[in-house]
Amino acid sequence: NSFCNLPAVVGRCKGYFPRYFYNTEAGKCQRFIYG
């Protein structure tokens, strides 16, 4: 999926938004929290 090509950028706000990035070491998409 195209969203898996995005880097894991955490952000600087108080939001809590689940996002995904492609972890090249693990070889799969992984979830992180943006906010």
UniProtKB/Swiss-Prot annotation:
<keyword id="KW-0166">Nematocyst</keyword>
<keyword id="KW-0632">Potassium channel impairing toxin</keyword>
<keyword id="KW-0800">Toxin</keyword>
<dbReference type="GO" id="GO:0005576">
    <property type="term" value="C:extracellular region"/>
</dbReference>
<keyword id="KW-0646">Protease inhibitor</keyword>
<dbReference type="Pfam" id="PF00014">
    <property type="entry name" value="Kunitz_BPTI"/>
</dbReference>
<keyword id="KW-0964">Secreted</keyword>
<dbReference type="GO" id="GO:0090729">
    <property type="term" value="F:toxin activity"/>
</dbReference>
<comment type="similarity">
    <text>Belongs to the venom Kunitz-type family. Sea anemone type 2 potassium channel toxin subfamily.</text>
</comment>
<feature type="domain" description="BPTI/Kunitz inhibitor">
    <location>
        <begin position="4"/>
        <end position="35"/>
    </location>
</feature>
<keyword id="KW-0872">Ion channel impairing toxin</keyword>
<dbReference type="InterPro" id="IPR002223">
    <property type="entry name" value="Kunitz_BPTI"/>
</dbReference>
<comment type="function">
    <text>Dual-function toxin that inhibits both the serine protease trypsin and voltage-gated potassium channels (Kv).</text>
</comment>
<keyword id="KW-1015">Disulfide bond</keyword>
<protein>
    <recommendedName>
        <fullName>Kunitz-type proteinase inhibitor AEPI-III</fullName>
    </recommendedName>
</protein>
<dbReference type="InterPro" id="IPR036880">
    <property type="entry name" value="Kunitz_BPTI_sf"/>
</dbReference>
<dbReference type="GO" id="GO:0042151">
    <property type="term" value="C:nematocyst"/>
</dbReference>
<dbReference type="GO" id="GO:0004867">
    <property type="term" value="F:serine-type endopeptidase inhibitor activity"/>
</dbReference>
<dbReference type="GO" id="GO:0015459">
    <property type="term" value="F:potassium channel regulator activity"/>
</dbReference>
<keyword id="KW-0722">Serine protease inhibitor</keyword>
